[in-house]
Amino acid sequence: MRLILLSGLLLLGTFLVNGHDADPEGEVLNSVLLTLMKLQKEFTNLFHAFLTVHKARSFGSGSERLYVSNKEIKNFEALKVICKQAGGQIPSPQLENQNKAFANVLERHNKEAFLVVGDSGNFTNWAAGQPNKADGTCVKADKQGFWHSTSCDDNLLVVCEFYFI
């Protein structure tokens, strides 16, 4: 989309620099301006459509964060790479509604998944007897959203967190 807009601006700039001799009626200039206005309107419509979908997803989960699984089963190190490549991060719920949205994904897939709790602020959701470093230095969430210490070598459901706006 940006490439098209930049191309239109380049064409418009070239036209203005070269003068109006090649297009005395201004047809090319009007055509370029009309195309740019259509593209701007289309971009605005796409942006509003994106916001509508985002708001609907947020409304349904009660969270401004989106938790998504690719259904793969991986260890913590592989999860870091996958989430980064996808443009997301390892889940780090900082509020109860975010943890619930995360737990909904786990319940739907009937699996457990890693999360990061170091930057979870004041919110925690440790299971009884947890954290227990003897179980491992990583943290997983069960299907109910309770947190447990676990080994980073465990293979769990890949879930990444995406934060919009």
Curated annotation (Swiss-Prot):
PROSITE patterns hit by this protein: C_TYPE_LECTIN_1 (PS00615), C_TYPE_LECTIN_2 (PS50041)
Where would you find this protein in the cell? Answer: Secreted
Chain ranges of the C-type lectin domain: 46-161
User: Gene3D superfamilies from the entry?
Assistant: Mannose-Binding Protein A, subunit A
Q: What stretch or stretches form a coiled coil here? A: none
Identify the stretch annotated as signal peptide in this record: 1-19
Q: In which tissues is it expressed?
A: Expressed by the liver.
Give the record's glycosylation annotations as residue positions. 122
What are the alphabetically sorted keywords of the record? Calcium, Disulfide bond, Glycoprotein, Lectin, Phospholipase A2 inhibitor, Secreted, Signal
One GO molecular function term? carbohydrate binding
> Per its UniProt record, what InterPro entries does this chain match?
C-type_lectin-like, C-type_lectin-like/link_sf, C-type_lectin_CS, CTDL_fold
Q: Which domain of life is it from?
A: Eukaryota
Report disulfide bridges, numbered on this chain. Answer: 83-160, 138-152
**Any one Gene Ontology cellular component term annotated for this protein:** extracellular region
What is the role of this chain? Answer: This phospholipase A2 inhibitor binds directly phospholipase A2 in the presence or absence of calcium.
Q: What does the similarity note say?
A: Belongs to the alpha-type phospholipase A2 inhibitor family.
Quaternary structure annotation from Swiss-Prot or TrEMBL: Homotrimer; non-covalently linked.
Q: What is this protein called?
A: Phospholipase A2 inhibitor B4
What is the source species?
Answer: Crotalus durissus terrificus
